[in-house]
């Protein structure tokens, strides 16, 4: 009787000990995925700022950290903060032009007889 109990107890003990490690491994993988998503988002935000010319200016380390913290908040928090800010300003909203312009306008057509500057001198169009 004890011979049958011993392997059964060992099997149950092995299941109990292996159970938390599997769930903790899943938690670690989810945490790693969230960290990777956050790093990718911050990299994307830095690239947008660089393409907009914002990184050519002098920024203090604290200002950059605050900017990244605000931009990495979930969208619901950002909308809630925007609503709070609009209530604080009396409901007025200042609109700004987006960095990623989807409105790609063709370049101006040059008039006949116009002159362009070339490094050797002026040339006609």
UniProtKB/Swiss-Prot annotation:
GO terms for molecular function: hormone activity. GO terms for cellular component: extracellular space. InterPro entries: Somatostatin (IPR004250), Somatostatin/Cortistatin_C (IPR018142). Keywords: Cleavage on pair of basic residues, Disulfide bond, Hormone, Hydroxylation, Pyrrolidone carboxylic acid, Secreted, Signal. Residues 25-97 form a propeptide. It comes from the Eukaryota. It is found in: Secreted. This is Somatostatin-2. It comes from Lophius americanus (American angler). The lineage of its organism: Eukaryota, Metazoa, Chordata, Craniata, Vertebrata.
